[in-house]
Amino acid sequence: MKKLFSMIAAALLALFGLSAQAQELTVRFFDMGKADAMLITAPSGEQILIDAGTNKGGKKLAERFAKDGVNAIDLMIITHFDKDHVGGADKVLESVPVARVVMPGYAKESKQYTQFMDALSQSPKTQVDVLSAKGETTFEFGDIALRITAAQETDYGIDEENDFSLAAYLTYGETKFLFTGDAEDARQTELLRAGDIACDVLKVPYHGRAVDVSAAFLSACHPKIAFITDSDDDPADPIVVKLLENMGTDVHSARDGDLCVVSDGKSVRVK
């Protein structure tokens, strides 16, 4: 009888453990060097990819998806069309089915943009949403909400394409994540004016460059965890790292490898 009770207790513990694990949201920040690629796995199982790194990074993502059993992407968000964000998107489209793509409403003359658009044309089942100026859309996957906002302007001047970056706010229970693409001063100011941007986890804008990341923006976000997509050849500015550390943020860099952050809806932790 005692043995039977122990077996039942163990089975119940395993069941409750699996149930708790199934309710976790996972966000993986991939080490792409000075390039962006993040994979969100919803508690209900949907897969959301934000950016796809460079062309080389796209190949790494395809290999990683095959290894980890990621057989489809429910939503792919391309924040803007710089080669270190869209460069690997064609490889993703060629390697797994992608149900939906959200991208900003401008075009770019580049090889990477052309390859991405060509790959999209070869994926007729992929629904494409273009967010033009002031556009906004929200997706819900089970208990998570993902709100995506477009830039407010149609012209930020010469060489200011980064300010067209889509921003993505992810909410699960009491926890919040903010993904900022390469938002520079003008776009960060828009986000500040739009309302509360406090978050538990922040993907630091524009690879942590001090000249392009405002202290006011970081202070308003006040994240518990931050990830910077930088590289040994082009590291984040120490001023940005120090600003974050001084507010108690646990700062992580792509130079240290992948980062996996988990939320149970009440708190976040590094896994």
Question: What are the language-model segments listed below?
Answer:
Residues 1-8:
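Bacterial N-terminal signal peptides that target proteins for export
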Residues 8-16:
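Bacterial N-terminal signal peptides
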